[in-house]
Amino acid sequence: MKIILTGAQGTGKTTIKNMLNIPGYIMGTEVARTLSAEEGVKINEEGNEESQWKIFNKYVEMFSENENIISDRGLTDVVAYSEYLATCGKMSWEGYNKMRTQMFDFYFDHRDEIINIHFPVEFELQNDGTRSMDKEFRDYIAERIKVNVCDIMMYAGIDSFELTGSVKERMEEMDRILKLKGVCKE
């Protein structure tokens, strides 16, 4: 299974990912951060069409190469950031629409292999030196991710769950979801 943790910056995805220990699963990287650090790819409000396609294609590659993976973010996230960039003229609408279509195609083709876990905004942003600290930007991204998650649920029949509450409550809910989906934790 591909367990995809999705949500805007600073919503607790990485915290939960780092607490999961599932035999046979690899921990995927947060692709945008990795590409930014290793290749200088522009992210957040500074992104552009080239950077978004690099990030998108890297996620597709990572999901295609790994049967069992826990991913910090997914295609719904990349498409949300791309929509923001299109509204700012930093990405073409044609490129955005093509990416959104490819997102739907990927999720439809892999619908039986994906568990989508959505993290809404519940916490104040913490400055880690990489994430954007702009609250309006985060709120925009959070809303667009939520729309994308709803769309893939309807279009592709993807199982999607929302995690809320304290870290302890989120882990209890995550354990329940994994048990429900037949994924055994250590």
Task: Pin down the residues of each PLM region.
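Hydrophobic anchor at the beta1->P-loop junction of P-loop NTPases
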Residues: 5
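Walker A (P-loop) phosphate-binding loop of P-loop NTPases
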Residues: 10
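Conserved lysine of the Walker
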Residues: 13
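Conserved substrate/cofactor phosphate-moiety recognition/catalytic segment
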Residues: 18-61
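Short loop/turn segments at strand-loop or loop-helix junctions that form parts
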Residues: 32, 73-75, 117-123
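Glycine-rich phosphate-binding loop used to anchor ATP phosphates in small-molecule kinases
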Residues: 52-111
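A glycine- and Lys/Arg-enriched "phosphate-lid" helix/loop adjacent to the NTP-binding pocket
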Residues: 85-168
